[in-house]
Amino acid sequence: MGKGGAVLTVGRPLPWQEAKDKLAYVRQHGVDQFIQHYRRHETKQRDTLLYGDEIEYGLFKLSSDGASLSLRGDEVRSLLSNREAEERRAIPESGKVTWHPEYGSWMVESTPEKPYSGYTDDLRRVESSMRSRRARLLMALKDDEVAPTVVAFPLLGMSNDDLPRNGPVASSVLVPDDVINPHPRFGALTKNIRERRGSNVNVEAPLFQDDNTTGDTIKADAMAFGMGCCCLQVTFQCRDVDESRHDLGVPLCRGAFTPSTRLVSIRRGRGWFLF
């Protein structure tokens, strides 16, 4: 029984006004498909344990003026995917990584090409795979680019670039539409959620308090502040339906890796406040 994300494909997303007429159809067929899928698998017992990880990386550019987002995520992902394909043609057993687009145009995601099994040998492969993927990514960057292990870019929304705000997609006064991945899904997702709400996203992260703090929250007005967080996600194929109902990874999760956004400190340092 699988737990995790879906494969991202290219298509024509419907604008919100066009999508509204199809909501009832989508909901009903979604329920029907879920029931059929559930019935096919509800009696499975002792299914093979398979698992994998998804790692999201943020790409940043360094200059004498400081750090900024490097909006080359799609370009870097295409380069890495082409390199994997070339390796696979030359040496079939190589090319062990799949690269995926992510919400931010400064982001790239990697997964192992094939899932790990429950055997010890595969457990030992996890760290080496993560190291190998990061090494491949770094080799695709320019000399002035870095990809550190951080969840959120602290300067996002601080106007440290010349890109126009209030774009037609996010309509944000803090971040430009350029930070959204050019894949059609992400722009449509951003615009449709805003149009469905009738207003911009309203993010309020609790502000760290000290003697000189004014205000209680850090405000943001775009999905990029949450969807732009880089995370490690784990996908499991569970042995049966009962096991798949419970998130067994919860005791292992740690969330205090987002100490600041918009250059001020968050009270609890958790990226969930930005989603």
Task: State the predicted function of each range.
Residues 2-275:
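Phosphate/nucleotide-binding catalytic core
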